[in-house]
Amino acid sequence: MNNIRNFSIIAHIDHGKSTLADRIIQLCGGLSDREMEAQVLDSMDLERERGITIKAQTAALTYKARDGQVYNLNLIDTPGHVDFSYEVSRSLSACEGALLVVDASQGVEAQTVANCYMALDLGVEVVPVLNKIDLPNADPPAAMAEIEDVIGIDATDAVQCSAKTGLGVADVLEALIAKVPPPKGDPDAPLQALIVDSWFDNYVGVVMLVRVVNGTLKPKEKIRLMASGSVNLVESIGIFAPRSVSLPSLSAGQVGFIIAGIKELKAAKVGDTVTLASRPAAEALPGFKEVQPQVFAGLFPVEANQYDALRDSLEKLKLNDAALMYEPEVSQALGFGFRCGFLGLLHMEIVQERLEREFDMDLITTAPTVVYEVIMGDGSLIKVDNPSKMPEPSKIEEIREPIVTVNLYMPQEYVGSVITLCIAKRGIQMDMSYHGRQVKLVYEMPMAEIVLDFFDKLKSTSRGYASMDYEFKEYRASDVVKVDMLINSEKVDALAIIVHRSNSQYRGRQVASKMRELIPRQMFDVAIQATIGANIISRENVKALRKNVLAKCYGGDISRKKKLLEKQKAGKKRMKQVGSVEIPQEAFLAILQVDDK
């Protein structure tokens, strides 16, 4: 066991995490040059394309060190994005060490800091590595100073390497072996194994990626999952070197996979503890929690006959994405669809994109909303994740909205514009500190404001230099109202939005004027109104198309013209009573892209 090292790589998007992993795998001979491809561990097309890691992957490698010993290195790849922070914390708790990869030309960024603090909290040894030192604008001393300033770990002997050229990668592994402690654990104790990740394979069912903490596991033994309590027979176990290799046993300190014929991912939750049914462990490993969706949106098929296909696609995605929640929903305007819960905006985009790309779906998405807690007049509490479910204002005692703590990191020249943005989004400043060139701002902000377009705005005000991460803090009473859109005095449920009262008139007017541009002219006048309860806050009219009925009267008597005009007017009035307005699909999307001028 002394020659095992379990480690993961912490890095901001684009600081070269996956490339470094590729180099390490190549150096250890995990794959022949023929099988080597860019970003071996990012197996989803979407992961490669966006350059992000969504699911954790592993590689068990053997490395002959300079001291002549052969070490087993287990690399556990972690996602780097805020939305997947729970998956990161599970990956990190399976390790004893982490390589903190920092781009020598850019310095420390928000996600790195968030994940690094998480690693330090879990007691993981952090080894700083400066990557991309081959770039002409690389500045290693400044980057080291920044690591010490912002994160507060000693970076004087940080390893310098370039994952692209392969320079210094061996030094990284040597530093890893020297600094990271071997795993602790007792191979003879009752089995405890942490599920780091699990995914669904079409041939064998659920594959669980586990870190064995104590005990030993062999095939044909019965295992019990502690959170869900299900008992299954182990069919095969092994390691990924990055291709899978079966083994006769897995013992304490090792990272490998278990296949036990589990049919659904719900049974094998990330963070759960695996133990033997015959000789169970006394208690589960700490840190397991159920993942709660934070952001909700409705997904509707463009063609009504695709509803079943959409349900099947969501089911298949759910097999590989335990954080995705969905339930059927009916909207008068959009027909049948699903209300889906996501971890955050990136997660939502990825799910949408995978549905469109892997399953050929055409989707309409309603505006993302967060979960509000509503206290009713009789004291009962309900959770509202959909504007159309919001009760009548007269029955509501108070509405509480989710507040998050946002950590923002940016170069100091952008502080002013970022603060202005945060104030516009109803943020309350909690803290501000300078670290070298970088500034860290801490704000409390309503989740609803972040969900809308905060991230894009942040990137544009700071020219892409600012980075952020956020975590849920609490529910707080707030003056939010539901704005309904009426078209010819009929409510359209899919257009309802929940906004803060101070912003409601503005948003109502904005949506109404956007709708006016998008609803085609009819043969009768169409009135578009935004209302809060019974108060109408804004109105736009789409003028009717009309035939020139006076074209055939040359000169002639005014009463004749009047008669024709009155007749036309009566006809239009009658049409307005029976006619219905078709709302084009773009109109629903317009609610999403509300650009604040």
Swiss-Prot record:
Q: Where in the cell is it found?
A: Cell inner membrane
Any one GO MF term held by the record is:
GTPase activity
* Biological process per Gene Ontology, one example term: positive regulation of translation
Which family, according to UniProt?
A: Belongs to the TRAFAC class translation factor GTPase superfamily. Classic translation factor GTPase family. LepA subfamily.
| SUPFAM superfamilies per record | EF-G C-terminal domain-like (SSF54980), P-loop containing nucleoside triphosphate hydrolases (SSF52540), Translation proteins (SSF50447)
| Highest classification ranks of the organism | Bacteria, Pseudomonadati, Pseudomonadota, Betaproteobacteria, Burkholderiales
Q: What is this protein called?
A: Elongation factor 4
EC number(s) from the headed UniProt entry: 3.6.5.n1
> Which ranges carry the tr-type G domain?
2-184
Q: How does it sit in the membrane?
A: Peripheral membrane protein
Q: Which PROSITE patterns does this UniProt record tie to the protein? A: G_TR_1 (PS00301), G_TR_2 (PS51722)
Superkingdom of origin organism: Bacteria
